[in-house]
Amino acid sequence: MNRFLRRLGVVGDIKNKGERVAEASANSKLIVIVEDDTRIADVFAEMLTRAGRWRLHFIADGQVARDQLPDLGADLILLDVGLPSLDGASLYRILRGHNKTRNTPIVVITASHEWELHRMGLQTGLLLRKPFKFQELLDIIHALLPEE
């Protein structure tokens, strides 16, 4: 378990990976978290719910994300690299090539030291390496989704 999870602990399992709305209105910004590890998804859900008034939508599979993301209208995508059925690097390239998602901010989250992933993240300016402090993620989110 990485430093991030040890520090935060792990909250209950997310059974339904669909949309979670916590004190968020229908016009709140939508953050889509593409993460297959339920423990990490649970931590994201808990911490992002406490930290802001965003709508959260979880997708645990790369192919499902490829099919759903263009029509979700996400304001921000948090994209794990290690996904089943379609890896995050391939999904990233697909999303950047799609007219509905090409301008959506994507934060690439990885523990990998692979250069291609870092280059991909550096092109967007939005690469977050595990382990990270949750405040780092919040700072990125607040910069990309300023409150109105």
Could you say what each language-model-derived stretch is?
Residues 61, 87-93:
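Acidic catalytic/metal-coordinating carboxylates
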Residues 38-57, 64:
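Two-component/phosphorelay signaling modules centered on CheY-like receiver
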Residues 58-76:
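Acidic, metal-coordinating helix/loop segments flanking the phosphotransfer/catalytic sites
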Residues 35:
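Conserved acidic carboxylate
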Residues 84, 102:
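The feature encodes the CheY-like receiver
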Residues 45, 90, 112-129, 135, ...:
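Alpha4 helix (beta4-alpha4-beta5 surface) of REC/receiver domains from two-component response regulators
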Residues 80:
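Active-site residues of response regulator receiver
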